[in-house]
């Protein structure tokens, strides 16, 4: 593998230079070649039509290559809340992904289901999929007799209408035949997607009508009981998040309950609510966060995985919104990382090539509503009163000593 470093003499970025030297030192199969655009002005034209900035890279192996622009290494993203830009360094992730791409003969195939009002994938998640070197295609079950054989995984993302019974059978057969299914679907304004969630019934999982509301203040964020901070169970999908103390956020979620063993496979809960959670039957029409007579008691699973006895696999996230850029940012990227871990496990990439970019700004601190209230009381009330009390004691002590001296 050859990494061409496109840079003018004296304009080398120290961080990129240090990173490239580590790649070259740690592997005898990687060679770094510096190309000065002043000396070789047309060199990059055979690889890309883009404008090539200083400190851009080209990774090549045989007849495959990938261009890495400077703005793919130092990533700037607009922050609509602070009207500023967040900058992160993604050199390691971009280079490792490019090396994986140029040395791979076949890339995983992800097929996205369409035809049910599915939302467009958020830009951040799409970029992560591209970085993982997974090729994405769209398809409709209405125009095929079965799921394409070349599909390594089928993704159903944020549908707004239900699938038909015939489509349900096709997807069920796909999993029974060893297929892999990734679903991100929460409640809709019309209610529960009965046929879609019916795929889980064969494995002893039932969906509860309505929207999950969390009554335990340690388990929801931003003073919004429908924005859940669920508990994470250890698994290949969640272990990396648990180790680094990241917490996914699940907004507007469908509640799922394991009703018993079906004999068709093994179900593993990934994210669960507290025992105090309940599902509001009113769904999107709810007028109060208080529990009412017909509401359904928790706890619920809001993310789970299924390993079918046939070899098929399902990973199910019961929220259509958790990958939206806003919630992903509030979770400091934990939502996107968990989804990518799930996708990587399904397509057979046990060691995900997607490496977290290093933020040059800051991450959001996600805390529960009760912790937020406690901090407010401490900062606004307790600490000022404490310092006031100490000050009064000091003044009285000094006056007492002065009086005794007199």
Please name every model-derived segment.
Residues 1-406:
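Short, surface-exposed patches at the edges or C-terminal ends of soluble domains, predominantly
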């Amino acid at each position: 593998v050859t990494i061409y470093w496109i840079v003018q003499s004296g304009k080398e970025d120290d961080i990129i230079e240090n990173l490239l030297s580590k790649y070259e030192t740690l592997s005898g199969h990687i060679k770094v070649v510096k190309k000065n655009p002043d000396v070789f002005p047309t060199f990059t034209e055979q690889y890309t039509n883009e404008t090539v900035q200083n400190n851009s890279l080209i990774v090549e192996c045989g007849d495959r290559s990938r261009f890495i622009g400077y703005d793919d290494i130092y990533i700037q993203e607009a922050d609509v809340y602070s009207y500023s830009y967040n900058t992160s360094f993604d050199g390691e992730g971009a280079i490792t992904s490019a090396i994986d791409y140029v040395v791979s003969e076949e890339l995983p195939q992800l097929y996205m289901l369409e035809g049910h009002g599915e939302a467009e994938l958020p830009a951040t998640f799409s970029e992560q999929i591209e970085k993982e070197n997974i090729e994405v295609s769209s398809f409709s079950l209405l125009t095929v007799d079965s799921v394409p054989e070349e599909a390594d995984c089928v993704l159903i993302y944020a549908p707004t209408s239900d699938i038909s019974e015939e489509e349900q059978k096709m997807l069920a057969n796909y999993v029974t035949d060893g297929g892999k299914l990734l679903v991100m679907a929460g409640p809709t304004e019309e209610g529960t997607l009965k046929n879609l969630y019916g795929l889980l019934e064969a494995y002893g999982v039932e969906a509860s009508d309505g929207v999950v509301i969390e009554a335990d203040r340690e388990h929801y964020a931003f003073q919004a009981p429908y924005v859940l901070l669920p508990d994470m169970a250890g698994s290949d999908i969640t272990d990396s998040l648990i180790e680094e103390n990241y917490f996914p956020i699940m907004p507007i979620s469908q509640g799922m309950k394991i009703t018993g063993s079906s004999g068709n496979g093994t179900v593993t809960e990934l994210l669960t609510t507290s025992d105090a959670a309940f599902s509001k039957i009113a769904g999107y029409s709810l007028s109060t966060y208080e529990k009412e007579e017909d509401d359904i008691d928790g706890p619920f699973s809001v993310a789970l995985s299924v390993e079918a006895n046939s070899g098929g696999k399902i990973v199910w996230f019961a929220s259509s919104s958790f990958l939206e850029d806003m919630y992903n940012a509030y979770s400091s990227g934990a939502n996107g990382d968990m989804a990518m871990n799930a996708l990587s496990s399904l397509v057979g990439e046990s060691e995900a090539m997607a490496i977290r970019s290093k933020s040059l700004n800051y991450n959001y601190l996600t805390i529960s509503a009760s912790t937020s209230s406690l901090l407010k009381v401490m900062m606004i009330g307790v600490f000022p009163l404490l310092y006031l009390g100490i000050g009064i004691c000091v003044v009285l002590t000094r006056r007492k000593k002065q009086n005794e001296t007199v």
